[in-house]
Amino acid sequence: MEKRETFVQAVSKELVGEFLQFVQLDKEASDPFSLNELLDELSRKQKEELWQRLKNLLTDVLLESPVDGWQVVEAQGEDNMETEHGSKMRKSIEIIYAITSVILASVSVINESENYEALLECVIILNGILYALPESERKLQSSIQDLCVTWWEKGLPAKEDTGKTAFVMLLRRSLETKTGADVCRLWRIHQALYCFDYDLEESGEIKDMLLECFININYIKKEEGRRFLSCLFNWNINFIKMIHGTIKNQLQGLQKSLMVYIAEIYFRAWKKASGKILEAIENDCIQDFMFHGIHLPRRSPVHSKVREVLSYFHHQKKVRQGVEEMLYRLYKPILWRGLKARNSEVRSNAALLFVEAFPIRDPNLHAIEMDSEIQKQFEELYSLLEDPYPMVRSTGILGVCKITSKYWEMMPPTILIDLLKKVTGELAFDTSSADVRCSVFKCLPMILDNKLSHPLLEQLLPALRYSLHDNSEKVRVAFVDMLLKIKAVRAAKFWKICPMEHILVRLETDSRPVSRRLVSLIFNSFLPVNQPEEVWCERCVTLVQMNHAAARRFYQYAHEHTACTNIAKLIHVIRHCLNACIQRAVREPPEDEEEEDGREKENVTVLDKTLSVNDVACMAGLLEIIVILWKSIDRSMENNKEAKLYTINKFASVLPEYLKVFKDDRCKIPLFMLMSFMPASAVPPFSCGVISTLRSREEGAVDKSYCTLLDCLCSWGQVGHILELVDNWLPTEHAQAKSNTASKGRVQIHDTRPVKPELALVYIEYLLTHPKNRECLLSAPRKKLNHLLKALETSKADLESLLQTPGGKPRGFSEAAAPRAFGLHCRLSIHLQHKFCSEGKVYLSMLEDTGFWLESKILSFIQDQEEDYLKLHRVIYQQIIQTYLTVCKDVVMVGLGDHQFQMQLLQRSLGIMQTVKGFFYVSLLLDILKEITGSSLIQKTDSDEEVAMLLDTVQKVFQKMLECIARSFRKQPEEGLRLLYSVQRPLHEFITAVQSRHTDTPVHRGVLSTLIAGPVVEISHQLRKVSDVEELTPPEHLSDLPPFSRCLIGIIIKSSNVVRSFLDELKACVASNDIEGIVCLTAAVHIILVINAGKHKSSKVREVAATVHRKLKTFMEITLEEDSIERFLYESSSRTLGELLNS
């Protein structure tokens, strides 16, 4: 009792220290004093006295330290806080905070019979000073804000003012902070919004903040935030349009995953609305989404998001009353019109919405009207299937499959059968569009989910079997996916729909995406892991006998569908089978047969009558499968040393016997490959004879059994033996002084046998071409690799000899081998540069030396010779140049060529164009330009000046090349046309590279001006040759241009970005008088017309047309002259441009 009285008396100006101490004790968790308990125990009289004292104290504090002075003190900074005014302000704020805390606690103990006028006055005062508080007083602001929220929630007098204050403060804070707590608190007092008058000017700031909430992720993601946003639609009917406009403007930046939340906001707003608000939401928002869902282009980033919103409403129609009727009413004026629109994309968009929303009906309609409406919609489905636009037909297929799957029981059987026959009987064989055929097989699995469809589909689907052989990969993929679905749902036996023979033929030849699916389809048929292992072997033999190549592909992907242990078991099961076949062939079973061997014989008795070692194809197939299976689990076996050792030992024990029995080359190759998986010590007799076998091969032999032998030596770490062999065969600079002494290596190679340089080149090329073997080769001693490089370099002297000596024979390599050796020399030098790049440009400099050799020896020789002499040696010098350019292109592509190397290469390319007749190098040169254009961004060490100089040279090389091609057109039109068509791909890639990496740079503008000059010159030349003005009709299509221009412009219009840049440059050329005169300007008009007729129409066409039109007007005086070609061109071009600009 005494404590309560003491507390009440402490609320005064004289005892303010004690009052503050009481409040402080309440804040300390360790102290037993509780302000809430104390207030709850106060009598009515004590409460009223306390509240009056609080009001008096608050008034006194504010009179002594007015709030407007606080802002001044705050502005003067922290130093001013130490002054008398600053300390007084601090004390005042502390007292007001304590008063606010007591008032906040008092709200919960207010009784209606009590007089709380004094408390109300305190709340009004605190509410009034809230906005005037300095920014630094967040603690007091928060406390007063909590008081306003609590006062609003209790519904006490003046709650509108406190509610508005709390609403604004929470709204502002929720947008500034990233926590969701303020959003939740704002939702609790969202009714306070209706205290604001929408039409008053003071509500402007509120509107802006509320609209900002619609693009705030915290509000969109949080449940309370979405509830709050949906309630804002009910504030004022005029605010709805502002909300919808804000959301539409932000759609492009919102993630697609958030669209379901946006749709939920609209849906909740619609569900709660009534009267004019409901009408506005439906007409201004939902129907607006419907309109844009139909009319927005598919490529628009907003289109898919609009559809997400509409999908949400479509899915709600079955669970929420009124949605179905609303969709029917809102779609009615726009959807059916969209389905009949002339624009095919609009029809396609409308079809998508129609299919998703089907059936679109008003549940309030009478049965007869409802049936009529549904019948009309089925007719729309039929019309979609017959639409001339493939995308609409594809959407129709989707609709038929979704609708029949969902409403199978309710649909009339005749309609059902007719629709499915249309899909499977006609559209599955739509020759005009692979997308339509693909849609059939992508959508049919939807119907399979309905078990009632299985009997009918079992009759219809076998007619589609040949779709497995469709010329479109995506159709084949979709067809196999459908077969997988049939198998999964057990709708039918998949081999009755598509016979196994067809499946195996596709498995043999098809691409990886199709093959992997086919393996998944037939996996359990040929590797039934749940059955005994002898069955695995039987199925394996069956598959090999049915289709050898398909068996290889099947087991190549088998490891993806079962455990590695099963693959290892299958390897040994096949080994048991081969062992049993050999035993039957020799008819001498071992006397002391082990228990395991007994099991082996038992396992394969089923195959006794069908399998024999004399069946070479089957034996080879089984051996190949062992190799394929071993390769597929090689990495897994590395982690299971015990299993790997067991497998090696088992095969090591039987391989000698296999080599004796299986003597056919088809069997030898997989046997050699098997040995390459094992260490040399496991097969010592064979490993010792490999190098002798390689040495004894004849040059020019067709078979490639040497490949597996080389693989063996590389896997055994014996690449040094190969190097010794080829070193003895390759010519050297001191060939005459070569000693006949045998090699000091473990394998002795004698010189009594003839040298075989061409075979040496075959071996080296194989090692360099295959990554694993190349790695082994490059890990050989550096000295041996350098010696090999030197030996290959002797090919240069042979090539010089072939060119310079009429009918002469090379000293080392033959005429056929010399270019090959030269190519290997170049390739090896680059591989060595990559391997030892940390040591500088040791090997790259060798390639640079090769470039100097090409320049000084080959190009200078060509320049000095007569045409007749060069014809005899054309093949040789073309091979040299092609080899050099190919290797240099690869050097730049992998980033080994620095700025200096690239610059030398470009200069050398100019030399080749000036010296060599013919254009065999053009494709390679364009590839080089493309790579340099891209690599100039990667070389970070180059200065800006070096890069600019390099790109300038790129542009010069390109210009020179195009000039050479243009000259060839004039001299030999047919040859020039063939050349240009052959280089379309690299030319397009080069232009695209320049466009994507160097837009609005000198090289970009230079390349485009070169591309402009060619067509302008050719078209101008053609126009000048015309004698009859009737032949001067403007072109309507690309095919109307002359051949050179047709090729170049055809490449330009493939890319919309290139078209825009090309038009910008054309405009600049016209404006700067680079293109001048009536004839050249007419040529520019022809180019503009062709681009405008293409698929990448650009707004820039009008800009260029206007510029050309202005230039043409400067030649207006020609209309005063007599009839001439130029006058006709002027009038025709002016008329054409006028029509274009006014269209």
Curated annotation (Swiss-Prot):
Modified residues (Phosphoserine): S30
GO MF, any single term: bHLH transcription factor binding
Coiled coil regions, renumbered to chain: none
Superkingdom as given in the UniProt entry: Eukaryota
Pfam families: Condensin2nSMC
Keyword Cell division: yes
Cited PANTHER family: CONDENSIN-2 COMPLEX SUBUNIT G2 (PTHR16199:SF4)
Disease: Khan-Khan-Katsanis syndrome: An autosomal recessive neurodevelopmental disorder characterized by multiple congenital anomalies affecting the ocular, renal, skeletal, and sometimes cardiac systems, defects in urogenital and limb morphogenesis, poor overall growth, microcephaly, and global developmental delay.
Subunit (UniProt): Component of the condensin-2 complex, which contains the SMC2 and SMC4 heterodimer, and 3 non SMC subunits that probably regulate the complex: NCAPH2, NCAPD3 and NCAPG2.
The protein, known as: Condensin-2 complex subunit G2
Biological source species: Homo sapiens (Human)
